[in-house]
Amino acid sequence: MDITGDSQYQCWNLTEKDAEKVRELLSHAQKYEAIEMRDAIAAGLTGWWYGAYLMSEEKFMAVAYITQSFVYLFGRDKTAMRCIGRNLGRNSPKRSGTASHSIFGPDALVKAFWDGFEVAGKDVKSDTLLNLCELTEILCKQNDAYAVRVAEKKDFALVFEFLGEALIDELGMDVRRLGREGHEKYCSEQIANGRILVGTHRGKPAFVGEFRETPQGIFLEHAHFPIAMRRPKVMRGIHARVAELLLGRAPTLLFYVDAANEDLKAAVDEVGYHVVMPGRLMRLR
């Protein structure tokens, strides 16, 4: 157990005995806050969780959920989150080879975490405002030039390439070369599970994306367009077809959009997406 410089908090790696108090903290999240964390804890406090405990009130004020490539943040107090960042930064390796982590959560909490975490050898690769957008109704007309369907075995090569490109920023490496066997297995499993979509523009490959179902709706993830297809008109046409397919499975479609990507914002706005939760994504190297 680490006791921070601020004596009102204690920080430690969480175990199952802490689960109920973590759930109590997460119960204060708004509808679209801490979705990944709430989904993860539904089956128990597995994986790596780290928390800041306010001793005077006997409750957690901030928690971090750490996966292979992400650090998800939620809390009710910036000081508590700064303490988490300080302790994790103190114990973090100065260099981590080719691997990278992405810190994600509400803007103020990511800032507080980084204020505590920042250590020599940890650099910010990118710092992005990432908006969670919701779609419940398609507002634009469909165009027959675009088509989207669930990927099949015959699409493996396309999925392998496009999904590999989509994962470069998240993982900090090109899994098509540095983790080829694992990436092949992942693509095959996701295709078999019916969780990959492929899209075309006039018959030419234009899009690959993944989706997963959550209590809040269907999440569209790792949505990738090759450079030649990153035009607002094309992205609008593909996203409209994606929505047509997925809204047949659930009433709500969710998608994270880079607030600085004007072309993508314009495309999804026309389809009918609107911002429901702003967030911040900081990628480290």
Regions found by a protein language model. Give the residues of each.
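Short amphipathic alpha-helix that is part of the acyltransferase structural core
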Residues: 1-35, 138-176
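Conserved donor-binding loop and adjoining core beta-sheet/short helix segment
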Residues: 7-10, 14, 30, 37-96, ...
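Short alpha-helical
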Residues: 17, 79, 108, 262-263
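Active-site rim helix/loop that mediates acceptor-substrate recognition in acyltransferases
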Residues: 30-49, 175-196
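Acyl-donor-binding surface of acyltransferase catalytic domains
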Residues: 60, 67-146, 255, 279-285
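Conserved acetyl-CoA-binding loop-helix of GNAT-fold acetyltransferases
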Residues: 79-90, 225, 231-247, 266, ...
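Residue-level signal for inorganic ion chemistry
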Residues: 106, 159, 220
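Contiguous, function-dense segments enriched for cysteine-driven chemistry
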Residues: 196-199, 205-219, 235-236, 245-285
